[in-house]
């Protein structure tokens, strides 16, 4: 990796683009999916590299810079969205005593304080949990929300009401409005007991749900659609701050936290008021020494300026307050032997290498497995079975390999598989991506359940009565072995189904009727239901607007693949010119003009239909269903040819219905606001998109005005 000072402007721009994409990917995994794949230390290193490049090239700072963003968007969450009255911020990090000293010096410079003037802070342990905001009105809990992207989170009010640590009513003299913010977490002992219980309750111990660590367990338990699941999990809460308030009970951070504690909400027992940096560092060392004995996982100590009037003067940078910083703990390390490398296949087909280790204790925890992330990471480390390695456990979460001590020893290099170990399908990596994915899709047992669940979901075929439990049952019985086409053959198992526990004649017949009603499905929904990478609901509609008949899709996919093979980049042709030439060919072959269809979609289609298993699956499916040709009837309207964005809660129609209306009026329904947007339709709770539209001078209307436009088009 080049030193930042030696980067050219073009290299800096390219690296910032790569880092923005990479950090956003890891933010989504950590905050939205509760399945991080790199350690805190590796994540922090990416952010530090991004910050260093931005400081050297400030004119190259991107709109999607990680330093401007908090958490991850909750677009895909099944939970209702909540717009925070006051943004939930992140924290900047310190990794050494010098960083803490510089933080204090920055505060002094900003406030114009003399060196001898007292500067007090609070210090408390940084719990590794899920951030949550509790809104109390007149002392009564009325809403709870996750952080999400800092602006919009998920509504988890029913779930939070089941957590014993969180009072439904505060006691004492409470301001009319007071949002308490803190961490939902799971204690180490409770985490171990939960995994043991899930194992004991499982019919098949090999298939028992097991959480990787307490943070994942806490996040997965809180973000449930069914609050009774949350109630069965041992969740706890510690407050560390506040959001919107109508009044404050004191004028210092420490005093307000003590007031919150007096109202009945737990705060950290390690919270302390510190006079100066030396006192902060003493408290940090004390907490670090006791870390292994604490009942919960922590990954550092948070320092905050104590005086609230000084906090107000210091204010915020893009994603974090100037008056607070998180002092992270160094990673803990140990030596061991890499015994084997296994490949796990995830629900999206991603092949993840997992290192099997001679068990070793790292930071008080026995580690026997470690993620190796991807084939590039294996190549970078040069690891092979038999190597002696150093394992690091950073942030009390994910163990990782940081060094191969025997890479120079002569031994055959590890060869990453080019076929799926589960189903034998080709495993490929798309251009510009490090992840290798199985192309088997629905014929791959590792992916089959999730793909079938997606196929029958509301956005796809929307088969009522065919939920997760039924799909799992039918898969176990072998009734869905060939993929989605077998759904339409379930009627042949009617008598067997009636004989099974939990199935009555009415429920069986209702399910079979719902399936039969989808024999002529909307072609775009059918295509979306296949779960082809990069082919979402909007892309599926855009594709079918061009090709019309879905039966033509495999042929078009073959044309796309053939064009790439027959048209390599010409010597002397710039990458940009080749990309433009390829994009033009893609749009000509598919007869589309939509912005969202380009090389990624073309490559995904080509890979999917090139796989023989998928062609068999496709032909089998079309033998059971007959989607009519896809025809988009458009009407003349004032939005014809324009780009429309819907944001906020729509009260008279679903988001899908609104997008369909826009397309019927000849408009394009986009998911994000940009300079190309012509109109924004905003419902209650509209947040960042509405602000962006205002800053760009884009026309904004409400749902009633949109209904008038639709009505006027006839």
UniProtKB/Swiss-Prot annotation:
Enzyme class: ligase
GO molecular function terms listed in the Swiss-Prot or TrEMBL record: DNA ligase (NAD+) activity; metal ion binding
Keywords tagged on the record: DNA damage, DNA repair, DNA replication, Ligase, Magnesium, Manganese, Metal-binding, NAD, Zinc
Domain of life of the organism encoding this protein: Bacteria
Reported cofactor(s): Mg(2+); Mn(2+)
Active-site residue list: 126 (n6-amp-lysine intermediate)
Sequence positions that bind NAD(+): 40-44, 90-91, 124, 147, 183, 304, 328
Span of domain BRCT: 634-714
EC number(s) from the headed UniProt entry: 6.5.1.2
Reaction(s) catalysed by this chain's protein: NAD(+) + (deoxyribonucleotide)n-3'-hydroxyl + 5'-phospho-(deoxyribonucleotide)m = (deoxyribonucleotide)n+m + AMP + beta-nicotinamide D-nucleotide
Cellular component, GO annotation: cytosol
Binding site for Zn(2+): 420, 423, 438, 444
A single GO BP: DNA replication
Cited PANTHER family: CHROMOSOME TRANSMISSION FIDELITY FACTOR 18, DNA LIGASE
Annotated family: Belongs to the NAD-dependent DNA ligase family. LigA subfamily.
Function of the protein: DNA ligase that catalyzes the formation of phosphodiester linkages between 5'-phosphoryl and 3'-hydroxyl groups in double-stranded DNA using NAD as a coenzyme and as the energy source for the reaction. It is essential for DNA replication and repair of damaged DNA.
Stated name of the protein: DNA ligase
Source organism: Sphingopyxis alaskensis (strain DSM 13593 / LMG 18877 / RB2256) (Sphingomonas alaskensis)
Gene: ligA
């Amino acid at each position: 990796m080049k030193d930042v000072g030696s980067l050219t402007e073009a290299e800096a721009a390219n690296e910032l683009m790569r880092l923005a994409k990479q950090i956003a990917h890891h933010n989504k995994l950590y905050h939205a999916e509760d399945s991080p794949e790199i350690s805190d230390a590796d994540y922090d290193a990416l952010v530090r590299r991004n910050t260093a490049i931005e400081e050297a090239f400030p004119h190259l700072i991107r709109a999607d810079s990680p330093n401007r963003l908090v958490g991850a968007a909750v677009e895909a969450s099944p939970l209702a969205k909540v717009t925070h009255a006051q943004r939930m911020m992140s924290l900047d990090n310190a990794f050494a005593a010098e960083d803490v000293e510089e933080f204090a010096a920055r505060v002094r410079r900003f406030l114009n304080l003399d060196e001898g003037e007292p500067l007090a802070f609070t210090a408390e342990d940084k719990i590794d949990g899920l951030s949550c905001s509790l809104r109390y009105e007149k002392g009564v809990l009325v809403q709870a929300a996750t952080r999400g992207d800092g602006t919009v989170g998920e509504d988890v009010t029913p779930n939070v009401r089941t957590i014993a640590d969180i009072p439904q009513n505060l006691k004492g003299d409470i301001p009319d409005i007071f949002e308490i913010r803190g961490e939902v977490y799971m204690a180490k002992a409770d985490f171990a007991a939960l995994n043991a219980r899930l194992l004991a309750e499982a019919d098949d111990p090999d298939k028992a749900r097991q959480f990787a660590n307490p943070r994942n367990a806490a996040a997965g338990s809180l973000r449930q659609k069914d609050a009774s699941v949350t109630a069965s999990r041992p969740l706890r809460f510690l407050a560390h701050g506040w959001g919107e308030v109508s009044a404050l009970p004191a004028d210092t951070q420490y005093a307000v936290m003590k007031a919150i504690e007096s109202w009945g909400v737990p705060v950290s027992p390690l919270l302390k008021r510190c006079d100066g940096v030396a006192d902060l560092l003493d408290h940090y060392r004390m907490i670090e020494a006791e870390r292994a004995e604490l009942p919960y996982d922590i990954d550092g100590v948070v320092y905050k300026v104590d005086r609230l009037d000084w906090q107000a003067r210091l204010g915020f940078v893009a994603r974090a307050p100037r008056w607070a910083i998180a002092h992270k703990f160094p990673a803990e390390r140990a030596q061991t032997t890499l015994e084997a490398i296994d490949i796990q296949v995830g629900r999206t087909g991603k092949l993840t290498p997992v290192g099997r280790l001679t068990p070793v204790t790292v930071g008080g925890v026995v580690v026997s497995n470690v993620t190796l992330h991807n084939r590039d990471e294996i190549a970078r480390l040069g690891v092979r079975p038999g190597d002696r390695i150093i394992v690091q456990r950073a942030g009390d979460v994910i163990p990782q390999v940081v060094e191969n001590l025997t890479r120079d020893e002569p031994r055959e290099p590890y060869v990453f598989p080019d076929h799926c170990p589960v189903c034998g399908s080709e495993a490929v990596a798309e251009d510009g991506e490090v992840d290798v994915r199985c192309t088997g899709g629905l014929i791959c047992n590792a992916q089959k359940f999730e793909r079938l669940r997606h196929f029958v979901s509301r956005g796809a075929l929307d088969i009522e009565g065919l939920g997760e439990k039924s799909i799992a049952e039918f898969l176990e019985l072998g009734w869905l072995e060939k993929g989605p086409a077998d759904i339409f053959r379930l009627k042949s198992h009617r008598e067997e189904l009636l004989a099974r526990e939990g199935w009555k004649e009415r429920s069986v017949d209702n399910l079979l009727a719902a399936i039969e009603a989808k024999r002529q499905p909307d072609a775009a929904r059918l295509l979306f239901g296949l779960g082809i990478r990069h082919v979402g609901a909007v892309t599926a509609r855009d594709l079918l607007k061009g090709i019309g008949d879905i039966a033509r899709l495999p042929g078009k996919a073959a044309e796309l693949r053939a064009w790439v093979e027959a048209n390599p980049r010409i010597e002397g042709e710039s990458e940009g010119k080749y990309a433009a030439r390829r994009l033009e060919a893609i749009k000509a072959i598919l007869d589309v003009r939509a912005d969202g269809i380009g090389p990624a979609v073309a490559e995904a289609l080509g890979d999917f239909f090139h796989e023989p298993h998928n062609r068999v699956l496709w032909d089998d499916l079309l033998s059971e269903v007959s989607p009519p040709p896809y025809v988009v009837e458009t009407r003349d309207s004032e939005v014809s040819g324009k780009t429309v964005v819907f944001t906020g809660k729509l009260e008279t129609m679903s988001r899908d219905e609104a997008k369909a209306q826009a397309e019927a009026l000849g408009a394009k329904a986009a998911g994000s606001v940009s300079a190309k947007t012509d109109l924004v339709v905003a419902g209650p709770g509209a947040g960042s998109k509405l602000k962006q539209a205002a800053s760009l001078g884009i026309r904004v209307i409400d749902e009633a005005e949109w209904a008038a436009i639709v009505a006027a088009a006839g």
